[in-house]
């Protein structure tokens, strides 16, 4: 357990730095992982209130490629909500809350939680009765072990256990 919010904020800043290209801690990432936050991005402020971590980035945060824009958000959400007492995050850029992805214009929740998903796979035919399952794949790359989460969205009538079994049979990892 953390002594206070300062400990959580300090750890959050370290995580953000490790996820930033050229960040002083980006070398802490495992060799099969890469920093995603654009080079030159600054963190103006990090605060924690009611288990919601608020991060205010510089405008360089939006210099992300369209291919990676959602991955950056997913990486931040997944990494920061693993901290004790952090249930969600809010992303601000130059003081304005991010409401949509910069390139695709896809709207994002104002408070991002693990429900946002990570490494998403969509197997849906409509927007009704959509369920979400997150699988954690244990991987070994050059004797470096890690866990890779993959969120599957589905609206099949089969139950979650069957979705998980079918997904594991055709594992992307």
Where are the regions that the model predicts?
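Bimodal "functional hotspot" detector
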Residues: 1-173
